[in-house]
Amino acid sequence: MPKLTSASSDFSEKKKSKIKKNASISFETALNDLEQVVTRLESGNLSLEEALNEFERGIKLTKQTQKTLLEAEQHVKILLSDTPDAKLNPFTLDSE
């Protein structure tokens, strides 16, 4: 198995740092980033390690955007409900 170079390690560390930052980005930014990830993966120009890192980032962005959409859906349902004292509850995904 080939040994990882310091350049690939640097790439991994940069990606990990960027992934951590994704936790606080807006839905629109996350969706745009996800589209960029898909474009890079579909290009076929990434090394295996880069592709795996991008795939991992894409999964995290997908989970984040799905959670945001589900929270928005819950909010809309409550706003449209006939119950005047309905409250928003923290939303959790079953897979987390």
Curated annotation (Swiss-Prot):
Annotated InterPro entries: Exonuc_VII_S, Exonuc_VII_ssu_sf
Composition bias type Low complexity, residue spans: 1-10
Top-level enzyme category: hydrolase
One annotated Gene Ontology cellular component of this protein: cytosol
Keywords assigned by UniProt, alphabetized: Cytoplasm, Exonuclease, Hydrolase, Nuclease
Record Pfam families: Exonuc_VII_S
Subcellular location: Cytoplasm
Reaction(s) catalysed (UniProt annotation): Exonucleolytic cleavage in either 5'- to 3'- or 3'- to 5'-direction to yield nucleoside 5'-phosphates
SUPFAM superfamilies: XseB-like
Region (Disordered): 1-21
NCBIfam families, A to Z: PRK00977.1-1, PRK00977.1-4, xseB
Chain's role: Bidirectionally degrades single-stranded DNA into large acid-insoluble oligonucleotides, which are then degraded further into small acid-soluble oligonucleotides.
Similarity remark: Belongs to the XseB family.
Known partners and oligomeric status: Heterooligomer composed of large and small subunits.
The name this protein goes by in its record: Exodeoxyribonuclease 7 small subunit
Naturally occurring in which organism (per UniProt): Hamiltonella defensa subsp. Acyrthosiphon pisum (strain 5AT)
This protein's encoding gene: xseB
